[in-house]
């Protein structure tokens, strides 16, 4: 079982008198930077010249520099850029300024685990990965709570990498909910597996296929959308709040019996084998190689799939239905 560390077991001591550079000011970047700053730590934000986020970060009360300037100024450097951009930015704008005893921090282990970034041996390398989107990391921090997080140490040059990781996790509010110790390998491989097999890939494929079956069987697209896509959130919220047990307890007996008897026929041994195949491609680096090569030519396959997805009948009818839900439109505007 994983080791869990809570707020009362941690201090900011390891980060006192250190400058933390947050590279990037997107969903996670803005949350990390603002939370750390409001925790009393010394934070700078590293952005490219001309970035649309520059003025936003300054208006949030943060000191903003170019990535190169931030790397030179910092003792601890958190890289919160898209996976496919991290290596090029690291080698051209961060590594030249690294000094012995500095620390590199990641929120996902992809580039370290798959050797896209190979840090010098005299710097600490660790991970702090909150298990929630940036706006939730930020909101829960301001509410005095937090989201759970993961920490991992890849390289401990100073002997203080774990202390730094815990202090950083405390600074963003993660220790309030508990941080779980893991490894770069475990975090990377399980994260990719979850994204591909159920959270993003498996779930979206299941929704689309179920929608298509109902429409092909002659049912109205609107009815198919409500039953196969719209109501997913209702079920997921129940699982999120209390696990599968809470979900089964909350639905009707008809839904429970039908779900328990038919579900295993849909997600069956063939599905399990496909999951193992996906996991093997993650473990042996095949997926990483494919993704890196795709990024080197500006993601033509991904862009084509995005276009196809946008044109899918599920998306067309879903857009029309969501336009008629005022409270949902307000939430999207607020986000």
From Swiss-Prot:
<feature type="binding site">
    <location>
        <begin position="83"/>
        <end position="86"/>
    </location>
    <ligand>
        <name>NADP(+)</name>
    </ligand>
</feature>
<keyword id="KW-0028">Amino-acid biosynthesis</keyword>
<dbReference type="InterPro" id="IPR014359">
    <property type="entry name" value="KARI_prok"/>
</dbReference>
<dbReference type="Pfam" id="PF07991">
    <property type="entry name" value="KARI_N"/>
</dbReference>
<dbReference type="InterPro" id="IPR013023">
    <property type="entry name" value="KARI"/>
</dbReference>
<feature type="binding site">
    <location>
        <position position="53"/>
    </location>
    <ligand>
        <name>NADP(+)</name>
    </ligand>
</feature>
<feature type="binding site">
    <location>
        <position position="191"/>
    </location>
    <ligand>
        <name>Mg(2+) 1</name>
    </ligand>
</feature>
<feature type="binding site">
    <location>
        <position position="191"/>
    </location>
    <ligand>
        <name>Mg(2+) 2</name>
    </ligand>
</feature>
<dbReference type="InterPro" id="IPR008927">
    <property type="entry name" value="6-PGluconate_DH-like_C_sf"/>
</dbReference>
<dbReference type="GO" id="GO:0004455">
    <property type="term" value="F:ketol-acid reductoisomerase activity"/>
</dbReference>
<comment type="similarity">
    <text>Belongs to the ketol-acid reductoisomerase family.</text>
</comment>
<dbReference type="GO" id="GO:0000287">
    <property type="term" value="F:magnesium ion binding"/>
</dbReference>
<comment type="pathway">
    <text>Amino-acid biosynthesis; L-valine biosynthesis; L-valine from pyruvate: step 2/4.</text>
</comment>
<protein>
    <recommendedName>
        <fullName>Ketol-acid reductoisomerase (NADP(+))</fullName>
        <ecNumber>1.1.1.86</ecNumber>
    </recommendedName>
</protein>
<keyword id="KW-0560">Oxidoreductase</keyword>
<dbReference type="InterPro" id="IPR013116">
    <property type="entry name" value="KARI_N"/>
</dbReference>
<feature type="binding site">
    <location>
        <begin position="25"/>
        <end position="28"/>
    </location>
    <ligand>
        <name>NADP(+)</name>
    </ligand>
</feature>
<feature type="binding site">
    <location>
        <position position="231"/>
    </location>
    <ligand>
        <name>Mg(2+) 2</name>
    </ligand>
</feature>
<keyword id="KW-0100">Branched-chain amino acid biosynthesis</keyword>
<feature type="binding site">
    <location>
        <position position="51"/>
    </location>
    <ligand>
        <name>NADP(+)</name>
    </ligand>
</feature>
<dbReference type="GO" id="GO:0050661">
    <property type="term" value="F:NADP binding"/>
</dbReference>
<keyword id="KW-0479">Metal-binding</keyword>
<feature type="binding site">
    <location>
        <position position="134"/>
    </location>
    <ligand>
        <name>NADP(+)</name>
    </ligand>
</feature>
<dbReference type="InterPro" id="IPR000506">
    <property type="entry name" value="KARI_C"/>
</dbReference>
<comment type="pathway">
    <text>Amino-acid biosynthesis; L-isoleucine biosynthesis; L-isoleucine from 2-oxobutanoate: step 2/4.</text>
</comment>
<feature type="binding site">
    <location>
        <position position="48"/>
    </location>
    <ligand>
        <name>NADP(+)</name>
    </ligand>
</feature>
<feature type="binding site">
    <location>
        <position position="252"/>
    </location>
    <ligand>
        <name>substrate</name>
    </ligand>
</feature>
<keyword id="KW-0521">NADP</keyword>
<dbReference type="GO" id="GO:0009097">
    <property type="term" value="P:isoleucine biosynthetic process"/>
</dbReference>
<dbReference type="GO" id="GO:0009099">
    <property type="term" value="P:L-valine biosynthetic process"/>
</dbReference>
<feature type="domain" description="KARI C-terminal knotted">
    <location>
        <begin position="183"/>
        <end position="328"/>
    </location>
</feature>
<dbReference type="Pfam" id="PF01450">
    <property type="entry name" value="KARI_C"/>
</dbReference>
<feature type="binding site">
    <location>
        <position position="227"/>
    </location>
    <ligand>
        <name>Mg(2+) 2</name>
    </ligand>
</feature>
<dbReference type="InterPro" id="IPR036291">
    <property type="entry name" value="NAD(P)-bd_dom_sf"/>
</dbReference>
<feature type="active site">
    <location>
        <position position="108"/>
    </location>
</feature>
<keyword id="KW-0460">Magnesium</keyword>
<feature type="binding site">
    <location>
        <position position="195"/>
    </location>
    <ligand>
        <name>Mg(2+) 1</name>
    </ligand>
</feature>
<comment type="function">
    <text>Involved in the biosynthesis of branched-chain amino acids (BCAA). Catalyzes an alkyl-migration followed by a ketol-acid reduction of (S)-2-acetolactate (S2AL) to yield (R)-2,3-dihydroxy-isovalerate. In the isomerase reaction, S2AL is rearranged via a Mg-dependent methyl migration to produce 3-hydroxy-3-methyl-2-ketobutyrate (HMKB). In the reductase reaction, this 2-ketoacid undergoes a metal-dependent reduction by NADPH to yield (R)-2,3-dihydroxy-isovalerate.</text>
</comment>
<feature type="domain" description="KARI N-terminal Rossmann">
    <location>
        <begin position="1"/>
        <end position="182"/>
    </location>
</feature>
């Amino acid at each position: 079982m994983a080791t869990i560390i809570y707020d009362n077991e941690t201090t900011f001591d390891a980060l006192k008198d250190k400058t933390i550079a947050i590279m990037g000011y997107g969903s996670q970047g803005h949350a990390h930077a603002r939370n750390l700053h409001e925790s009393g730590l010394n934070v700078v934000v590293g952005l490219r010249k001309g970035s649309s986020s520059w003025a936003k970060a300054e208006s949030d009360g943060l000191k903003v520099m170019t990535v190169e300037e931030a790397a030179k100024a910092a003792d601890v450097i958190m890289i919160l850029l898209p996976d496919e951009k991290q290596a090029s930015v690291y080698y051209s704008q961060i590594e030249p300024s690294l000094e012995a005893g500095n620390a590199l921090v990641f929120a996902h282990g992809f580039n370290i685990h798959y050797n896209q970034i190979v840090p010098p041996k005299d710097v600490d390398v660790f991970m702090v990965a909150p298990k929630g989107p940036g706006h939730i990391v930020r909101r829960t921090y301001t509410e005095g709570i937090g989201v759970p997080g993961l920490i991992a140490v890849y390289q401990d040059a100073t002997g203080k990498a774990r202390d730094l990781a815990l202090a950083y996790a405390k600074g963003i509010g993660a220790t309030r909910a508990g941080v779980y110790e893991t490894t770069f390998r475990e975090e990377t491989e399980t994260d990719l597996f979850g994204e591909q097999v159920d959270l993003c890939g498996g779930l979206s494929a299941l929704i689309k296929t179920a929608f298509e079956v109902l429409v092909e069987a002659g049912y109205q697209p609107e009815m198919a959308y409500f039953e196969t896509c719209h109501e997913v959130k209702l079920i997921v919220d129940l699982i999120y709040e209390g696990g599968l047990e809470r979900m089964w307890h909350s639905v009707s007996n008809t839904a429970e019996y039908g779900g328990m008897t038919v579900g295993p026929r849909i997600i069956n041994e063939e599905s399990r084998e496909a999951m193992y195949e996906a996991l093997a491609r993650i473990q042996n680096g095949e997926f990483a190689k494919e993704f890196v090569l795709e990024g080197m030519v500006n993601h033509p396959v991904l862009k084509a799939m995005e276009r196809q997805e946008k044109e899918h009948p599920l998306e067309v009818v879903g857009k029309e239905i969501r336009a008629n839900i005022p409270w949902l439109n307000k939430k999207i505007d607020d986000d």
